[in-house]
């Protein structure tokens, strides 16, 4: 009890602790700088999420007004498989879980197409110094209907299901719009298997 009262009421003890904390923080400051988020890997995915009727999901970015897009995201590690990147980003940005009962793993299809583009200036600080180009791999994800979406509010603030041409017109990025406009051809070449069946 005496020790408790001493710690609670002794101003000198509080001052020493405060000074120690400030001195310790000063010594750790260089290390804290080094522990910042690592640079983004300049290799990413774009996932066009659509229904059998070719309605397409587009989501609105939180950091840019009127910037609508499909799901996108970079690899977490250099050796991360692109399909894993795609599934992770879909779950993080929309709440849609690939491998669930109504969205089987086979619904995610690698379109075997990639583009390289110049990174927008406002995003260059996220990459290592000197990195100005990103390679993007395109995927399609067919869902059974216009499913409800749970956004990550830090990244996106709104979403819409639109006919594919309207979705393409709303996209900020020309390459994203191009991917969506290719949807009729790409979707028609796929055989969407019933859940539980295999090729």
Role assignments for model-derived ranges:
Residues 5-10:
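Short hydrophobic targeting helices and cationic amphipathic motifs
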Residues 14-15:
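Cysteine-centered motifs
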Residues 23-34:
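Short, Lys/Arg-enriched N-terminal segments with co-localized hydrophobic residues
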Residues 36-56, 78:
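Conserved N-terminal beta-strand and adjoining loop/helix that marks the start
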Residues 69-72:
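A short gly/proline-enriched turn/hairpin at secondary-structure junctions
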Residues 75-175:
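Unchanged
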Residues 168-199:
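Charged phosphate-binding loop/patch that engages nucleotide di/tri-phosphates or the phosphate backbone
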């Amino acid at each position: 009890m005496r020790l408790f009262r001493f710690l609670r009421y002794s101003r000198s003890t509080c001052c020493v602790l405060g000074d120690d904390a400030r001195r310790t923080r000063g010594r750790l400051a260089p290390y804290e700088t080094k522990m910042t988020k690592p640079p983004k890997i300049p290799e990413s995915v774009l996932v066009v999420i659509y229904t059998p009727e070719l309605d397409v999901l587009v989501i609105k970015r939180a950091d840019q007004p009127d910037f609508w897009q499909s799901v996108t995201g970079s690899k977490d590690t250099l050796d991360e498989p692109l399909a894993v990147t795609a599934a992770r980003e879909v779950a993080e940005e929309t709440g849609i879980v690939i491998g669930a009962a109504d969205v089987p793993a086979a619904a995610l299809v690698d379109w075997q197409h990639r583009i390289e583009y110049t990174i927008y200036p406002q995003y260059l600080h996220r990459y290592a110094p000197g990195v100005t180009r990103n390679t993007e791999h395109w995927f399609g994800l067919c869902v059974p209907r216009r499913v409800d979406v749970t956004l990550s509010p830090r990244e996106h603030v709104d979403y819409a299901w639109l006919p594919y041409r309207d979705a393409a017109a709303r996209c900020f990025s020309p390459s994203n719009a191009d991917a969506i406009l290719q949807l009729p051809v790409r979707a028609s070449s796929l055989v969407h298997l019933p859940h539980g069946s295999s090729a």
